[in-house]
Amino acid sequence: MITGIISILCYLQCFGTLSASVTAKNENGNFVLKNKNVELVFANGKEFLFKEFRMDGMNILPVDGSTTHPWQLIYRGPNGENPTLMPRWGEYKGGEIQKTQDASTLIFTWQMVIDAGPTCPVRILVTLGKDAELPEWRIEAEMPEGWVITESEFPRIAVNRPEGAKGILPVGFGTEYTIGNEGQLQSRYPSCTGTMQLVLMHHKGGTVYFAAQDKGGSGKVFRMKSEGKSLVFIQNVTTSYAWTQNKKFCIPWETVMGFTQKGWQDAAVQWYRPFTFETLWGAKTISERPIAEWIKNADMWLRPGEVNAETMEAVRKAMKYYGKGVGLHWYYWHNHRFDTKYPEYFPEKAGFKEMIKETQELGGFITPYINGRLWDPATDSYKTLNGKDASCRKADGTLYTEVYSSKVLNTVTCPASYIWRDVLKGVNKQILTELKTNGVYMDQIGCANSEPCYATNHGHAPGGGDWWPFAYRSLLTEMRTNLYKENQAMTTEENAECYIDLFDMMLVVNSPHNSYTKMVPLFPLIYSDRCIYSGYTYIPWRITDGSLNFMSMRSLLWGSQLGWVEPSLLMRPDAKREAKFLKNLTDFRRQQHDLFLGGRFIQEIIPTGDNPTQEIPNYEITSVVLAAEWASVSGEHVYLIVNMSEQEHKVTLPNKKQITVKALDAIRISK
């Protein structure tokens, strides 16, 4: 117990003596933590109860308070004991107040029976700084020698769920979901289903914000679970064994919650965007990063899908039509079916070298596909290089094994394994030197989940934690230094934030789009000034039904590089309208680099006036003219307006200015 008190005091020493602008007191049977922005009320009784969370003029908790259990921990003992403990399995000891110069903290303690020795405390700490807009939540637990915490479910906070409330998750660009009376929404970070460490619930009365302030990028899952008229916000973490030191466990970051009567966009920009500038990945803008120059100028991408005469002829036509500077993301260049025989890409298909050279002479820049995460255990290399020792292992010693449409088993490799690091470096070197490409596209790194790994030979602590993104960080940095020349580019699939500064460009195509969801520009709001990204969603095989034109319009407005279309599909005679619109927008985008190379996306706009709607199959019903506000590198605020229809339209912008936009065209005007 003495050790626990000392640790709390050490944690709080960084703040100094209490300021009058933040108060923590015990009054009328309650603990009250309050500053000018926030007021939290907890019961001071025999049972823990979070009674009120007042912010921006509203109490966001249910009438009876947040009655869900505030934490749940899974322990692992030296004999294999594996209990799941929560408050009801312990003795609640009440709360106490710790005051310092710049902050106050409420500490709530439960004593838990772990073994025959003394009981072991679990504490939650709720801290509010004198000027803070968001209270910070932490958890710590003490335990006997030889024990660790393997899973944490904290915090768990139930808020009132108004009728019609919707959830915003950082899935792809950002996705809005309907919240039902039961079930849950979930976002796994870092991956395409959790590109950032926040989730939001919004309704006509305002927005609830829930986020982790983790500068390391550890794996975690955010959940929003419906319980009647309440919504429980939950953070699940598979822990690192390194987080248990000297018989004490703590999660090495704060979790925060807030409320604003403004919209979800305001909440994300006000609270999450500032945090990202404090991270390794978000500290530098595009103009401050060493990005390949051709990537900056690649306003459009093609996606050749084969190595044959028909594909090359389509590439020639497309390059002639769209001009120099186009990026080409080339698939199926190796002699095996897709998602098989990784990482054995060589020898390449006959004629690929010649196609690369010709395309480059036409002004194109090529990044061929490889996978940066999977190893097929049926390959010769897996056997000869002892691939099983590079594979990521579950706690029970088995391998993470994934199966895709190829129906072939693929094992997930651990990025900390030097076997796999050497393999990935070797493949990159061979592509760059033998094929002489302009870079390499490494699939899945920015998209697929980081997995907890319990292998004992990889040099990291067992479990989860930030070692996974840091392992990729050190590997990619080494490759950049030793293998890549100045104008050669690394690209990847999707936009998990912890890898932003490691890649020249990130392909964003995994956002869900159907009648149950709505794509929203959450990622551009936060990172449009620090990340170059391309794509919108996967390109459907039928592009003449309005879907490609809609995707091209949205891509431009959200700051994405355009296209990523199979050239033989794009250059068909029946796709002339789509090809022309894409060319118009590509030519337009080439003139807007003061926005897209260090400027910032501000908001999406639906102009009023003559602006009919069109149903886009498998997407949404959209106005045919959409717009966006951007801030340029110099600080100028402008509107971009795009008309995807074949008729001109006269529309009205938020500044009341009326503007006529020609058919299949885009314009820029100052705000």
Curated annotation (Swiss-Prot):
<feature type="signal peptide">
    <location>
        <begin position="1"/>
        <end position="24"/>
    </location>
</feature>
<dbReference type="InterPro" id="IPR046226">
    <property type="entry name" value="DUF6259"/>
</dbReference>
<dbReference type="Pfam" id="PF19773">
    <property type="entry name" value="DUF6259"/>
</dbReference>
<comment type="similarity">
    <text>Belongs to the glycoside hydrolase-like 3 (GHL3) family.</text>
</comment>
<keyword id="KW-0378">Hydrolase</keyword>
<dbReference type="GO" id="GO:0016798">
    <property type="term" value="F:hydrolase activity, acting on glycosyl bonds"/>
</dbReference>
<keyword id="KW-0326">Glycosidase</keyword>
<keyword id="KW-0732">Signal</keyword>
<protein>
    <recommendedName>
        <fullName>Putative glycoside hydrolase BT_3595</fullName>
        <ecNumber>3.2.1.-</ecNumber>
    </recommendedName>
</protein>
